Amino acid sequence: MALSKRELDELKPWIEKTVKRVLGFSEPTVVTAALNCVGKGMDKKKAADHLKPFLDDSTLRFVDKLFEAVEEGRSSRHSKSSSDRSRKRELKEVFGDDSEISKESSGVKKRRIPRFEEVEEEPEVIPGPPSESPGMLTKLQIKQMMEAATRQIEERKKQLSFISPPAPQPKTPSSSQPERLPIGNTIQPSQAATFMNDAIEKARKAAELQARIQAQLALKPGLIGNANMVGLANLHAMGIAPPKVELKDQTKPTPLILDEQGRTVDATGKEVELTHRMPTLKANIRAVKREQFKQQLKEKPSEDMESNTFFDPRVSIAPSQRQRRTFKFHDKGKFEKIAQRLRTKAQLEKLQAEISQAARKTGIHTSTRLALIAPKKELKEGDIPEIEWWDSYIIPNGFDLTEENPKREDYFGITNLVEHPAQLNPPVDNDTPVTLGVYLTKKEQKKLRRQTRREAQKELQEKVRLGLTPPPEPKVRISNLMRVLGTEAVQDPTKVEAHVRAQMAKRQKAHEEANAARKLTAEQRKVKKIKKLKEDISQGVHISVYRVRNLSNPAKKFKIEANAGQLYLTGVVVLHKDVNVVVVEGGPKAQKKFKRLMLHRIKWDEQTSNTKGDDDEESDEEAVKKTNKCVLVWEGTAKDRSFGEMKFKQCPTENMAREHFKKHGAEHYWDLALSESVLESTD
């Protein structure tokens, strides 16, 4: 069912609000399309097909809400109209004109008597207070209305007290009472009292309702004209004459009354404050309206989203409007202080660079750093120790070498014999000679294969000759079909050809099955590949130590980590400024491949986004000296692995890096790499 233009206008704000809630922003195109669907009377399916290009997945939910709103609007309008009709009916029952006219026995219609005829004939005019509008009911008017209703009820009681009165009798005021008074009977006093009380109660309710309506209309200045008309119409309906307002009072403005001091006063002499209209800018008007709108948004109760099935409290709801950002002015002299701080920092760095350059030329810097790396010695160079370190293990503590005649017990365990310890084989060196494999040439491989096949064929022929195995079927092909079968091929060529092709397919199938039986499974291939990459390190672990100046590029880090994992190498990468140490442990073949990766395949001198920032801060001369490169510090063997899976460790200080290596028992790797870095920086 299509909707009228008025109904569509009432529905439009709700559709705009729903579209903004579904899409997150207002879209006039979707609103127009939805109004078009409702206006044409489409059903849910057609409306969903029409709106699907705009809303996608939210179409069905939006269409359901749209049709629910249409149904609610219809029901609300229906209930509103029914309530208006019932209210009018109730007022009509109390103050309306009588519709039922009693008839005489002859059937002649009598003239209808107005209900408040006596009131209409009265020329009395009720003056209203000057402060109230002529269309509004005053207290005196309401009192007059109550008195008129009481008189009308008294008159009706008099009419009902006669038997068959000539005048027409009105029907009972209450429509809810189905019983009618018979015309020819005398009304009882109890019934008359009941009728009077009901009429007075309804009149009181109607007066209260009218006063409440007038009070609400008074709050809306735009509707005061309509309110005046309604009030005047009600006064005429009740038989109360409205206050007469002269035409000159309506057309002419209110006279201005001034006192002796020139102030505006009313008729009673009280001072009146006039409203002064001052011109203002549009910007100020918009600002006031904006503040009022914000205040309304704050006062507006927020929708209860927690009752929604799809409400997620973790998701923050974005505000409908972006908060206005104010200007932030900088204090005077702020940037001058920043510039002065930067100049001071640059001068300090320049001074430090000059001192460092002078220290490099004199060698003070290098010797200082090497002294920090080298282990501390208890004795100075050239001093003779009192006891050698190898004797300290057998001499007891507190032994005094300065004593002239030491006791014999002090030499317990010392004899005049020389102890020769047992000879042990080195843990990693293997003196067994390595035999080189003998590889045949292609010609020798073919000859050996022919001999092997010939021997196997002779063995099969011997078994057939002795009757141990049945003779094999002749190997028939299409090319030797006539030569092998002869007469049979001539008699039934089709049958023979089918037989030959079946033999060929059988041989092909047997060949493929043999190949599949020899083929390794996926698990076996995986194990074979891992076995090929994993080398035997029972005789010793091969170790390589590399030093890289800059290892901040994530691509190069990934190459190191990925290749170490693929080659089943273990180790560690310690990241420190200008000294990045890479230690790898594994077999000799894997070390060979990893060495080629570090020294040849990776281009260390490539400029990256990370290294450019470091090089820009340094001078051109230092940038040339500190070109990124990788150096092999040391390679050798050890009995066991010192590290686990390849990992990266960030060490801001040298002590932290050395402690990390010391924890794994390999601090000498760090000392060696750092000393080479120090010596290289002095060159």
UniProtKB/Swiss-Prot annotation:
- Partners and quaternary state? Component of the precatalytic spliceosome (spliceosome B complex). Component of the U4/U6-U5 tri-snRNP complex, a building block of the precatalytic spliceosome (spliceosome B complex). The U4/U6-U5 tri-snRNP complex is composed of the U4, U6 and U5 snRNAs and at least PRPF3, PRPF4, PRPF6, PRPF8, PRPF31, SNRNP200, TXNL4A, SNRNP40, SNRPB, SNRPD1, SNRPD2, SNRPD3, SNRPE, SNRPF, SNRPG, DDX23, CD2BP2, PPIH, SNU13, EFTUD2, SART1 and USP39, plus LSM2, LSM3, LSM4, LSM5, LSM6, LSM7 and LSM8. Interacts directly with PRPF4.
InterPro entries according to UniProt: Pre-mRNA_splic_Prp3_dom (IPR013881), Prp3 (IPR027104), Prp3_C (IPR010541), PWI_dom (IPR002483), PWI_dom_sf (IPR036483)
Q: Where is this region: Disordered?
A: 73-135, 161-183
Which Gene Ontology BP annotations are present? mRNA splicing, via spliceosome; spliceosomal tri-snRNP complex assembly
Tell me which UniProt keywords the record has, alphabetically.
Isopeptide bond, mRNA processing, mRNA splicing, Nucleus, Phosphoprotein, Spliceosome, Ubl conjugation
> What ranges does the record list as Basic and acidic residues composition bias?
73-107
- In this chain, the stretch annotated as Mediates interaction with SART3 covers 416-550
Tell me the protein's name. U4/U6 small nuclear ribonucleoprotein Prp3
| Record PROSITE patterns | PWI (PS51025)
Q: How would you describe the post-translational modification of this protein? A: Ubiquitinated. Undergoes 'Lys-63'-linked polyubiquitination by PRPF19 and deubiquitination by USP4. 'Lys-63'-linked ubiquitination increases the affinity for PRPF8 and may regulate the assembly of the U4/U6-U5 tri-snRNP complex.
Q: Does the keyword Ubl conjugation apply?
A: yes
The gene name reads Prpf3
Q: Where in the cell is it found?
A: Nucleus; Nucleus speckle
